[in-house]
Amino acid sequence: MKIFNSLTKQKEIFKPIESGKVKLYVCGMTVYDYMHIGHGRSWIIFDMVVRYLRMRGYEVTFVRNITDIDDKIIKRAGENKESPAALAERFIQILHEDEKALRVLSPDQEPRATQYVPEIIKLIQKLLDNQYAYTGQNGDVFFDVRRFKDYGKLSHRHLDKLQAGARVEVSDSKRDPLDFVLWKKAKPGEPKWDSPWGEGRPGWHIECSAMSSSILGQPFDIHGGGLDLKFPHHENEIAQSEAGEEKPFVKLWMHAGLLEINKEKMSKSLGNIISIREALKESDVEVLRYFLLSGHYRNPLSYSKENLENGRLALERFYLALRGLPVVNHEKTSSYTDRFYEAMDDDFNTPIAFALLFEMVREINRFRDNNQIEKAAVLAAELKCLGNIFGLLQYSPEQFLQGAKKEADVQEIKKLIDQRNEARAKKDWKTADQIRDQLTDLGVAIEDSSDGTSWRQE
């Protein structure tokens, strides 16, 4: 098996530190808002990685953290007039609901930053002892970036060309703009913990270093996350972990490509996010999972209704091939499974793996046409087993196909309403009335208001 290592910028033969066992840490959510489908892509990608590694016989320890104390949590809690702890707890429950709705496997361990404050303090003290950290004039403790000679090795940037990143705060207390905070001095009304440097709370980056190493040891096999975390977050994790423990942090780094809308990254700051909950109102979970895994995990992926519809049609082909076949035990594998493994062993090449699944669909249909039902059923069982790695083909064919028809009907209704609104905007009342009649024939009642057009099925 070969996996692309962001640290070396090349595919490497994957050999776990301990034979047969894989220790994987993935950066989780900062719990102050709803998860959007950009997060969902990263979660589903690493869900696929865990499922595949386990299918290949590895004993995987999967750790994904929760950041439950952060500037954004404190700010949002203040706006909502609730405590940061209450806000975090509420969104942790929402996160778990979304995780279940996405069919994402729960991590083996899900540490919260607030549970690891003693370990964080211990690591900061090591950095101070090793002279990689200092206390600023404002009482915050900072990491001395220029003291760590390997800084920039993950993002492949030279220190002299680096600028303070989006999540690196500017402060007069820093020796260098790139220095980042390890411990923030307490402010009135904020959550705080005792430390040798006074009351305060951890910085964002140090949390992941302390949690991952405390649970998995150092070094461990794979650290994953979205591409947007590569710099400065993951770069800072390497610096503080290796400076503190004086040994390598992680063997292999994996980064999931970003989800884009109109060629822009999906992010809260750009205001173009679509929550998981909104997406699942529009599309079945299998359609969403198929779409999010259809491109190679390292590449950007463009979110659009057209791409989701292509995903629905693709799954329809799978389920039509499975419909009406007897259910048999999956006992034997064919060359299709070997070729599937070959694709997935090449840096989790899901586009090639999906192409192979479509080959299996065509073969199943050929067996059907030749009335070789037993052969079709055996291959269908193999197809379902491989589909499970992607969290797909979990419905009965009848269940999915009935739901897909309803989804297609809704999309058709929305399309007609959009066309009618365009006609009304052009004052083409004849066309608008014709479309209204079409909708009436479909059993759809529409109501126009200043907020737009609403509809219901009668």
Curated annotation (Swiss-Prot):
Keyword annotations from UniProtKB, A to Z: Aminoacyl-tRNA synthetase, ATP-binding, Cytoplasm, Ligase, Metal-binding, Nucleotide-binding, Protein biosynthesis, Zinc
InterPro entries the UniProt entry points to: Cys-tRNA-ligase (IPR015803), Cys-tRNA-synt_Ia_DALR (IPR015273), Cys-tRNA/MSH_ligase (IPR024909), CysS_C (IPR056411), Rossmann-like_a/b/a_fold (IPR014729), tRNA-synt_1_cat_dom (IPR032678), tRNAsynth_Ia_anticodon-bd (IPR009080)
Subcellular location: Cytoplasm
Organism field: Coxiella burnetii (strain RSA 331 / Henzerling II)
Chief location category: cytoplasm
Motif 'KMSKS' region mapped to chain: 265-269
GO CC annotations on file: cytosol
Cofactor field: Zn(2+)
Residue window of motif 'HIGH' region: 29-39
Stated name of the protein: Cysteine--tRNA ligase
Assembly with partners or alone: Monomer.
Chemical reaction(s) catalysed: tRNA(Cys) + L-cysteine + ATP = L-cysteinyl-tRNA(Cys) + AMP + diphosphate
One Gene Ontology MF term: cysteine-tRNA ligase activity
Gene Ontology biological-process entries: cysteinyl-tRNA aminoacylation
Binding site for Zn(2+): C27, C208, H233, E237
Family: Belongs to the class-I aminoacyl-tRNA synthetase family.
Domain of life: Bacteria
Annotated gene: cysS
Entry note: cofactor: Binds 1 zinc ion per subunit.
Any Pfam family hit: tRNA-synt_1e
Binding site for ATP: K268
EC number, as in UniProt: 6.1.1.16
